Amino acid sequence: MAELQMLLEEEIPSGKRALIESYQNLTRVADYCENNYIQATDKRKALEETKAYTTQSLASVAYQINALANNVLQLLDIQASQLRRMESSINHISQTVDIHKEKVARREIGILTTNKNTSRTHKIIAPANMERPVRYIRKPIDYTVLDDVGHGVKWLKAKHGNNQPARTGTLSRTNPPTQKPPSPPMSGRGTLGRNTPYKTLEPVKPPTVPNDYMTSPARLGSQHSPGRTASLNQRPRTHSGSSGGSGSRENSGSSSIGIPIAVPTPSPPTIGPENISVPPPSGAPPAPPLAPLLPVSTVIAAPGSAPGSQYGTMTRQISRHNSTTSSTSSGGYRRTPSVTAQFSAQPHVNGGPLYSQNSISIAPPPPPMPQLTPQIPLTGFVARVQENIADSPTPPPPPPPDDIPMFDDSPPPPPPPPVDYEDEEAAVVQYNDPYADGDPAWAPKNYIEKVVAIYDYTKDKDDELSFMEGAIIYVIKKNDDGWYEGVCNRVTGLFPGNYVESIMHYTD
């Protein structure tokens, strides 16, 4: 308030008086400059003096106007703030009056109403009659309720002519063996994990043969009679699992023990005895070696026949070739070989064709039959069951299916890694690792893993390796097409990855 009073009484009036004095001084200075310019002899000097007076006068007037304007603006700001404070006070008084009026109105309204008495009670009220607690009854856990659930192969047993599923428990393994049989790669896969342990299984009764058990006459080379199965089930069998690419081996070994399921072979072509050619597609490693299929007479024995005469010539190598028929016929090759693989159809004992090597014309290979049941290679059974082979009659083979699939022009997928089943000690790979204590001098310093060959392989190209079964190979690179690069006996080259197994699978 004092500042406002000082501006109104002193600053602004003094500024106005200064402006009036400047106006009068400017008039006198103008008269002097005009007379001086007329009377002076040196016109230039008189002009310069006039300019100096003019500049000084303008500066003085401008300063005085600026000071007076600032004082007026400051006065206006002070008055505006006072007005805002007064407005706020008036609003506060108005709100106070409104509140007082509302209180009075409520009081008057309350006089016209009646009082309401409310009883205060607890929100939660305990029940009058307490319920008796129910006694806990423990129910035992039934570990067999989920035995028939899932995609695994169910065991079948023949009882009074009816097929009834037999339940099995969880499998485990106590002492894992350090060797495994060199069964060829299969396309059938199980559903158990890769590291599932196993244990010794109890023998089960032989199953009955379903209607879709065999789908091709060529399969009869791998079929065995239930009599053999019955004799096999008289002793416990130990199965060992492995990790990595042979994980499905464990599942099949645990869910179909003792069931002689044959490996499917390609359906016979309908072109008769004419020569045909199988163009091998490139881009995948070759499957294990292929051997001619055996006729049915060498596999299925008649009742009462001598075991030695029917099974004396069967070896693990022949059963391996029979089980790899589907893999070799449906799998591809990494590159086109210089000499095309050639096959011809020959008459079979049961009317189906056999394949042998001849010079032939071009035709697509037949596709494999649909897999109605999981396939398990039968390897190493013959040495154990020759004495009991004639105990049971041989069931007749079922008729082939009516719906044979058409040929597929798309190239078949490459064969999967080997899927073996450790059923017999006679079918394991006997290998001796001379480098178990330390790597040899020719071994590479940096390698991915050390593997053992489970099949013999002869190179087709100069950049490939040749090795025998049981050879130790150091893998230095794994290609996406299934071929590995490794070192064996100071020789570096390529080899198919499904011909070897990691040594860790044997030592686990």
UniProtKB/Swiss-Prot annotation:
InterPro entries named in the record: ABI (IPR028457), Abi1_SH3 (IPR035725), Abl-interactor_HHR_dom (IPR012849), SH3-like_dom_sf (IPR036028), SH3_domain (IPR001452), T_SNARE_dom (IPR000727)
Compartments (UniProt record): Cytoplasm; Nucleus; Cell projection, Lamellipodium; Cell projection, Filopodium
Post-translational modification: Phosphorylated on tyrosine residues after serum stimulation or induction by v-Abl. Seems to be phosphorylated at Tyr-53 by ABL1, required for nuclear but not for synaptic localization.
Modified residues (Phosphotyrosine): 53, 213, 455
Keywords noted in UniProt: Acetylation, Cell projection, Chromosomal rearrangement, Coiled coil, Cytoplasm, Cytoskeleton, Host-virus interaction, Nucleus, Phosphoprotein, SH3 domain, Synapse
Function: May act in negative regulation of cell growth and transformation by interacting with nonreceptor tyrosine kinases ABL1 and/or ABL2. May play a role in regulation of EGF-induced Erk pathway activation. Involved in cytoskeletal reorganization and EGFR signaling. Together with EPS8 participates in transduction of signals from Ras to Rac. In vitro, a trimeric complex of ABI1, EPS8 and SOS1 exhibits Rac specific guanine nucleotide exchange factor (GEF) activity and ABI1 seems to act as an adapter in the complex. Regulates ABL1/c-Abl-mediated phosphorylation of ENAH.
Name recorded for this polypeptide: Abl interactor 1
Source species: Homo sapiens
